[in-house]
Amino acid sequence: GEKEWILTSAWRNDVVNSDDYRAYVGGTSGLIYGYVNDGFYTVADFESFDSKSRTWKLKEGVVDSSPLSDTPRPGNAKFKKLTPVDPNSTNPYQLTEADRTVIGNTTPKFSGGFGLNATYKGFDMSMFFNFMYDFDVLNANKIMLTTWADNKENNFLMDIASDKRWRNFDDMGNEIRYSPEVLAEFNKNATMWNPTSIGRPICMSYAVE
């Protein structure tokens, strides 16, 4: 019989691999299904840089996240490959949709509620309170405001402020993406990928809270 239900939240019609929820027989419902973030590429992830063609070559064993974050280069978002590497594949370390997994659970560990009713000199009042504890949500705002989806130059200030995100231009506006040493030094304290590397919404662990 059927053991897995593949579900789609349909919060947008252009989400990469839009089937973003799962339910399993004998398990809980509301499981968030997507990719696991692994930070971003740094200059150290690459074997070489060809200054003529301006292309980067990944080191052996480094995951190729190009299906999600464009051609690999420093600053682009990186994701974890969870499936076994196929040595017979032409690109054994490339990410595929099979590398998705359960990244969150929207079902609370427990929930409850209570109500109060009161009357006094002809006045009455009713109140009801409910609560849920220990559950995950997929924050779609984090997805849209840290990517280049729609090319609207959205900016999630706290996470991708200029002092946190990977930058390809210095403070004077000079392009540094093709100068490996300068690029690495300038971004040595970066904590976030360059948002222009992701062109479509992705269900990813970064957005699960």
Model segments located where?
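Outer/extracellular conduits and scaffolds centered on Gram-negative outer-membrane beta-barrels
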Residues: 1-209
